[in-house]
Every structure is written in structure tokens, then in C-alpha cells.
A protein has these predicted regions:
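A short acidic, Gly/Pro-enriched loop at the edge of an enzyme's catalytic core
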Residues: 100-112
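Class I SAM-dependent methyltransferase SAM/SAH-binding core
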Residues: 52, 58-101
Length: 204
């Protein structure tokens, strides 16, 4: 628990220092890739029940889900992100929390969206976060996780704070150990940037 609190503090402080800049660069759904919008939209349309947007940042993906008719809430470690999201989208529920200690009632969620919000988890910390997601999702509920595709657990210098690559196979194995069954995955590389990946899974 102490290790997770230390990691949470590292991520929180890193994003808090750049919250305004981050929101300007990435805080509008119109700035997001069409592929991401389609992927998340299709996934959300198949979720029955409440969706928790974990690491919601500026709140734009939570708003996207709500606009599609989903019952969605956003949580984030960074109070400035939550304050900004609540101001921009006052009709949506946002709160400051981490996945590890968000007090999600057991089996209360239809789905969890973890869109690049687990990339800063260490290889030792990731299983605990996936297990926390599984506890919150009822059997048959869904998880969608986005991440950077690469060698399993390899750290890289993300612009905010250290992040970690995972291969589709490696992340799939992590998900299966946490109590999920993988439904599908996708990968892509654009403009010479880091490779991206996502996995959709169901709680079993």
C-alpha cells in the first residue's frame, strides 16, 4: 500500500504541475484521434451499467461517454483536473480518487475505461490496479485499456513522468491473471510516434 501511495504521489504531482498545459493540448474530444473515438464509442455502446473513467484527466472522455447516453463518472488523482472537468461539464460526476482506493462497491460497475491511465503503473503495481478494477466490475462487465505497445514493463521517459510499455500479449496475460477474458485488441503506429494498443476484456 505504501508503495502504491508513493507511485500515486509521483503521478499526481507530475500531472498537477502541467495540468493547464495538458488540458490545452489534450483536453478536448475534437483533439482526439478518430480511431480512438470510434474504439471507445463502440466499446461503451456494449456496456450495460455504470462506467468509471479511471484517470479521467480533463474529463473529455467521460463527457464523450455521457453524450453517447452512458451513465459515466470520472475519477483522477489530480485535484486540478477534477476542478476543471467539473467546471467544464457540471452535469457530470467527477471526483478526486485513485483506482486503488476509490471505494468502488464490489461488482457495482458495468465497465471501466482505463485509457492510457495505467501507463505510469510499475510492473509490480499494475496487477494490483487491474485487480481493483476487476473487483469493481460485475461478472460480465467490461474493461477497455489503452496503452503504449512495446517490451513488457520497459520504462520510457514520458513527458510528464516515467511510463511503461506493454505488449498486447503481456497486457493480455496481466488481464487474465486479474480475472478478465480478452475479447479483442488493436495496435497502430502513426507518424513515427510510439506504437499504441488497446484491449477490450470481460470480467469473468
Amino acid at each position: 500500500m505504501a508503495q502504491q501511495e508513493t507511485e500515486d504521489a509521483r503521478v499526481r504531482d507530475g500531472y498537477a504541475a502541467r495540468a493547464i498545459e495538458y488540458t490545452e493540448l489534450f483536453g478536448d474530444i475534437a483533439q482526439m484521434d478518430d480511431v480512438d473515438r470510434e474504439r471507445i464509442g463502440r466499446w461503451a455502446d456494449g456496456v450495460d451499467g455504470r462506467i468509471l473513467d479511471v484517470g479521467c484527466g480533463p474529463g473529455h472522455w467521460t463527457a464523450f461517454l455521457v453524450e453517447r447516453g452512458a451513465d459515466a463518472e470520472g475519477i483522477d488523482l489530480v485535484p486540478d483536473f477534477i476542478a476543471g472537468a467539473s467546471a467544464r461539464f457540471p452535469h457530470i460526476s467527477y471526483r478526486t480518487a485513485s483506482l486503488a482506493d476509490s471505494d468502488i462497491p464490489l461488482g457495482s460497475l458495468g465497465g471501466v475505461l482505463a485509457w492510457y491511465s495505467l501507463i505510469h503503473a510499475t510492473p509490480d503495481g499494475l496487477p494490483h490496479l487491474l485487480e481493483a478494477a476487476r473487483r469493481g466490475i460485475r461478472e460480465g462487465g467490461h474493461l477497455l485499456v489503452g496503452f503504449f505497445d512495446g517490451a513488457d514493463g520497459q520504462p520510457f521517459p514520458h513527458a510528464v513522468t516515467t511510463a511503461h510499455y506493454w505488449s498486447v500479449l503481456g497486457m493480455s496475460n496481466q488481464l487474465e491473471r486479474a480475472g478478465f477474458s480478452v475479447l479483442d485488441s488493436e495496435t497502430r503506429v502513426q507518424d513515427g510516434r510510439r506504437a499504441h494498443a488497446s484491449i477490450s476484456a470481460v470480467a469473468i
